[in-house]
Amino acid sequence: MIPTLLNKQTLQLINRKQLKYSLVMAEKDYFLALALKVLEESKLYNKLVFKGGTAIHHCYLEQSRFSEDLDFTSLDKDLKATDVTDIFKSISFFEVKKVYTSKATIQIERLKYSGVLDQPNSLKFEIDFIQNVVLPPKQMKYTNVWGFDIMVNVMDIREIFAEKLRAMSDRARYRDFYDFYLISEQYNLDMIETINLVKQKEIRKPISKESILRNWKVVSEQKEEEINLIYYRQDIFNNEQGIEKLLKCLNFTTIS
């Protein structure tokens, strides 16, 4: 059953006591949970594997940072865009405004929501068809401060860790290094197994230790720019030497 919307006073109270986000960000966190509740009660639940930043921080790391996208890999390669958009049709507070499709993805680029703040806003809902899922997904609780009981079909943390390794090589984003470091701190993951998992997944371009270290240097020089864009519970640069040691200990040169 999809819950009714909370009022502004309750949003403010819960945010002040628990999240301490901006109110706009807190409302988005609330609608992320609602969108996943809609998914849980739909026919798509067992067809999509939840992954990415929102999955990490609501299933594995207890909201150590804010993440605003819903990312999935589809187990059903014949899934159509209408299969996805239809689950939101009967939900009064959601409106699908912009959809992009290709052989590689279905993206609801703007899943507009109408909340108590009366400010136009939207979520991004992205489904990947190219990236395979190697390990069996986990049935886990989506932790949230809003009191919703939500179960998700989420990617195994070992495979998420492997995807973060690839992401650090592909791009220079603080959030990737942040997630990789916190996962390595909280979970005793084997790096050899991680590299083997990377090799079993779709590799679109070579993954190299050199590019990871180069991207970390860029992130270190431009850290304030991204830190100011997204809420982070802690500053991993307080342990910058520990992160550099972790990255330099990566026991591979190139994966292709």
What are the functions of these language-model segments?
Residues 50-54:
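Glycine-rich beta-strand-to-loop/alpha-helix junction loops that act as flexible
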Residues 1-48, 58-64, 68-70, 75-256:
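Structured mid-to-C-terminal alpha-helical surface segments
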